[in-house]
Design a protein with these regions (language model features):
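Patatin-like phospholipase
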Residues: 1-41, 49-311
Length: 311
């Protein structure tokens, strides 16, 4: 539909909230917007790998729903830190305290709660591709090296290994040790992977599923306070990254926790609603770019950058 315009899609991290990406993809496809390249972080790398593998949003939805409802997925252990934001009885509150004590006890003796082998098995269930070369469209996956603090970008080689590293939540999933690196979740350094797409396409659509500070309840214990400290940094970093995108879609996910995989349908619907609300503006912007004479496109791009820097 947009011949000559290479469209990139940046899929942010956020655990179960990654299902929002599926809803957005469905709406984009329905309106003739088919990404030429995808970049994914953490949950976004999972959904990105599925989309790059099947290149069909409805197929991604079907496979994803099948897997998150399977016994194999439940065995990943997310139930240990699930955090309901709904009204709780006194018994639920007591149970939450027990869970928090459990996490603290385990973390004092180990670097993680679950082995990354479980993430590998989950990835292998979600899509058939094993190597980046098996994919139908290009995919970029980001992980984080906790030794250097750098983002590690993957475009080739083992797809499964890249996804495992990108999805290894620090302190929860076992890190990968490779080439003097300690590799964990890409969300640590690149909450929404916009920058890896900068030289790969003409127009970047970012899907932001990171919870803003206004979306979160006041922390009530040590675990939640520690988590909140990191969240502040992530929100500010993510804001910087999103400014590099040409268009941003932000699904509203009603304060649902990153481990709420039992709410997958709601996340998909949230993605659809956000995309439908934004689609007219997106289509208009794409049409304007396509109809802009090539000799002024670069000038238009820099004009937009200047507005962001000095407005």
């Amino acid at each position: 539909m947009y011949k000559g315009l290479k469209i990139g899609l940046a899929l942010g991290g956020g655990g179960a909230r990654g299902a929002c990406h599926i809803g957005v993809l469905k709406v984009l496809e329905a309106n003739g917007i088919v990404p030429d390249i995808v970049a994914g972080t953490s949950a976004g790398s999972m959904v990105g790998a599925m989309y790059a593998s099947y290149h069909n949003a409805k197929m991604v939805e079907k496979k994803y729903l099948e897997r998150v409802e399977s016994e194999n997925f439940n065995d990943l252990g997310f139930r240990y830190i699930a955090n309901s934001e709904e009204d709780e009885s006194i018994f639920s509150q007591v149970f939450k305290q027990i869970k928090n004590q459990y996490v603290l006890m385990v973390s004092s003796n180990r670097k993680s709660i679950i082995k990354n082998e479980r993430i590998k098995k989950a990835a292998e269930l979600l899509f058939d591709a094993k190597q980046f070369s098996d994919l139908k469209i290009p995919l970029i996956v980001s992980a984080t090296d906790l030794i250097s603090g750098n983002s590690i970008i993957y475009k080739s080689g083992s797809l499964i290994d890249a996804i495992v590293q990108s999805s290894s939540i620090p302190g929860f999933v076992e890190p990968t040790y490779k080439d003097n690196r300690m590799l964990v979740d890409g969300n640590v350094a690149l909450p929404t992977p916009v920058t890896p797409l900068k030289n790969e396409c003409d127009f970047i659509i970012a899907i932001n599923i990171t919870r803003g500070m206004e979306d979160q309840p006041e922390p009530s214990n040590i675990v939640e306070i520690s988590s909140r400290v990191r969240d502040v940094s992530v929100v500010h970093l993510n804001s910087y990254l999103l400014n590099e995108a040409d268009f941003v879609i932000k699904p509203k996910h009603d304060n649902l926790h990153w481990s709420a995989f039992d709410k997958t349908d709601k996340f998909i619907q949230a993605g659809e609603f956000a995309a439908e609300s934004a689609i007219n503006n997106l289509l208009e912007e794409l049409e304007n770019i396509v109809n802009t004479p090539k000799k002024t496109k670069k000038e238009t791009f820099w004009t937009r950058i200047k507005k962001r820097l000095f407005s």
